[in-house]
Design a protein with these regions (language model features):
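N-terminal Rossmann NAD(P)H-binding glycine-rich loop of SDR-like oxidoreductase domains
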Residues: 3-26
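Mid/C-terminal beta-alpha module of Rossmann-like enzyme folds, strongest
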Residues: 205, 212-258, 299-306, 311-312
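Rossmann-fold cofactor-recognition segment
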Residues: 42-52
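Catalytic helix-loop patch of NAD(P)-dependent Rossmann-fold dehydrogenases
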Residues: 89, 93-97, 117-157, 161-164
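NAD(P)H-binding glycine-rich loop region in Rossmannoid oxidoreductase-like domains
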Residues: 50-90
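C-terminal amphipathic/interface module of NAD(P)-dependent oxidoreductases
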Residues: 261-312
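NAD(P)-dependent short-chain dehydrogenase/reductase
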Residues: 146-194, 199-201, 208
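NAD(P)-cofactor binding segment of oxidoreductase domains
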Residues: 82-110
Length: 312
């Protein structure tokens, strides 16, 4: 049986890299990056801006992927609030371009959305709850969902992620670890919640859903909601970071430092995922420990700078 062709936008991002790491030996992986190429075996990467409809069209039509996983997006919430035009061009029109090209080859389309489509007033949101984004980033992700769901071969995944980003910006947890090693203090709200999951665990579940031919909307996260502060506590414990460098703050104080409004509780109900596919959510402790165990091999896979393993 021929291996599935999987096309990933945003190869150089947190999730893009994890999808390569977790699927490179099982699928034929192709994809795009915007600025910085990734360095890993078993992946064919191309420098293409998803706003460039013709270049994207030409590439996808030449590859004819079975599955397209659209991870590329501007995820800086405050940037999106300040530069709405660029945010819309990338997060909405870019999604439309990727989707249109995917339709032309009759491929399946997987759209990575966000828990920020919700307003944070309820918590443990399920797939039937009405989205109500508080900021422009969340609005662009919701518009991307709406476009995706017009296609009958689409899967929308709402989630919140963390992970390593070898050779990338300091958006990964290696950035947090390096900041702490340099003596900086991390502030985290104790009353702001989500269901954050590592990109590696999320990637495994995405590949499971591909094989299950899942469609519609699914929420993916860890077993229970967790506050930003509690998550940092557990991260500090697993990676043996000094607790004196972690300070808890109130959500209102966190919000005051931001430009865009943030939802306070966007934890996700994942029962639909469990009921439909018997996927049992992991605990955040198991998730962090699994990430710790692969840290050296993960950075080596991408030829990345050893932010983490040299200090562990």
């Amino acid at each position: 049986m021929d291996r599935l062709k999987i096309f990933i936008t945003g190869l150089s991002g947190l999730l893009g890299k994890a999808l390569c790491y977790e699927g490179g030996d099982k699928f034929n992986i192709y994809g795009t990056y915007f600025k910085k190429d990734i360095k890993c075996a078993n992946v064919s990467s191309y420098k293409v801006d998803i706003r460039d409809k013709k270049s994207l069209d030409d590439l996808i039509l030449s590859i004819k992927p079975d599955i397209t996983i659209h991870t590329a997006a501007i995820t800086d919430v405050d940037f999106c609030e300040q530069d709405k035009e660029t945010a819309y061009e990338v997060n909405v029109n870019g999604t439309r371009n990727v989707l249109d090209s995917t339709k032309k080859v009759s491929g399946k389309f997987i759209y990575i959305s966000s828990d920020y489509v919700f307003d944070g007033n309820k918590g443990y949101c399920n797939e039937e709850d009405m989205p109500n984004p508080l900021n422009y980033y969340g609005l662009t992700k919701l518009k991307g969902e709406m476009l995706s769901l017009e296609y009958d071969r689409s899967l929308v995944i709402r989630t919140s992620i963390y992970g390593f980003n070898p050779n990338g910006t300091r958006e990964g947890i290696e950035g947090i670890i390096k900041d702490v090693k340099e003596g900086l203090t991390i502030q985290a709200p104790f009353d702001m919640y989500n269901s954050i999951i590592s990109v590696n665990m999320l990637s495994k579940i995405i590949y499971r859903l591909i094989l299950e031919n899942a469609q519609g909307i699914y929420h993916i996260g860890t077993k229970r909601r967790i506050s930003r502060y509690e998550f940092m506590e557990k991260l500090f414990l697993v990676f043996d970071l000094p607790r004196r460098n972690l300070v808890q703050i109130e959500f209102k104080n966190y919000q005051n430092k931001k430009i865009a409004r943030r939802p306070q509780d966007v934890s996700l109900d994942t029962n639909k995922l469990t009921n439909d596919f018997k996927v049992i959510p992991t605990t955040i402790e198991d998730d962090l420990n699994a990430l710790y165990k692969i840290s050296s091999s993960y950075f080596a896979y991408f030829g990345g700078e050893q932010y983490v393993s040299e200090d562990l």
